[in-house]
Swiss-Prot record:
Residues 99-120 have a biased composition (Polar residues). Pfam families: BES1_N. Keywords: Brassinosteroid signaling pathway, Cytoplasm, DNA-binding, Nucleus, Phosphoprotein, Transcription, Transcription regulation. Disruption phenotype: Reduced brassinosteroid (BR)-mediated quiescent center (QC) cells division. This is Protein BRASSINAZOLE-RESISTANT 2. The keyword DNA-binding applies. Residues 1-40, 85-122, 164-190 are annotated as: Disordered.
Amino acid sequence: MTSDGATSTSAAAAAAAMATRRKPSWRERENNRRRERRRRAVAAKIYTGLRAQGNYNLPKHCDNNEVLKALCSEAGWVVEEDGTTYRKGHKPLPGDMAGSSSRATPYSSHNQSPLSSTFDSPILSYQVSPSSSSFPSPSRVGDPHNISTIFPFLRNGGIPSSLPPLRISNSAPVTPPVSSPTSRNPKPLPTWESFTKQSMSMAAKQSMTSLNYPFYAVSAPASPTHHRQFHAPATIPECDESDSSTVDSGHWISFQKFAQQQPFSASMVPTSPTFNLVKPAPQQLSPNTAAIQEIGQSSEFKFENSQVKPWEGERIHDVAMEDLELTLGNGKAHS
């Protein structure tokens, strides 16, 4: 009863599967028939040729497996009843054949070579044998009259004897052995955070090196008393330097620490038009300017460890905070 019930159940399942499966159209069925007829015609011609010209014991109605067995037997292979195929004298172990779809042979890539990269090689990877490279190396050309040399001009003293021997290898890089220090302590792979930190540190270094040049305020005017100095005043056409309030507005901005440590060079001189205001170029003194400088020494005074000279007609230390008045939109100062 159980077997009958199981049979009926399986038949019902098969019928349900056939009912739900899509039925092929008449064109698809015709194509399948034509394809099958062509395959059988080709197989029949193959069998006829093998029977006529080959010493094959093929049955009258045989399939492709029989033909494959006959061909393997002629080529020196052994085909067992279960389909195990191997060369004569190289029968594989039962463990090697179980669970593998491809038959392993001594010439198969599944067998690891003793010279594989997983083993410690006594020969360095860049030292190749003469037969391993498809291109001859100029340092190991045995025959000077070898016509296969790609660069014939390198044979007759083309390479200096002082250079080390050239090693050429076309093989892929091998895995370093376990005894290698790079294998024990591999370099960490770069991450986005490390790359960002490195780029930020490089940008900071570049910005600090750019601060080595002295900076000066562009708004610093050229005082008329600079005519008494060693150079002619530098003028800025875009600015009106007649206003005396720009002199008393604030100190000049200068970072002269780096400039004091080492002398100026042609590459360090900034292109600002007011650079000559602070670092004048040396010029020869004329007798007139020397006399004027001696006259004006009495009106100098110390300001931040430097000599400051007033303009002609200018009063220093006479302007107090009480004399200044803040006007909002009047445009008129307190007289």
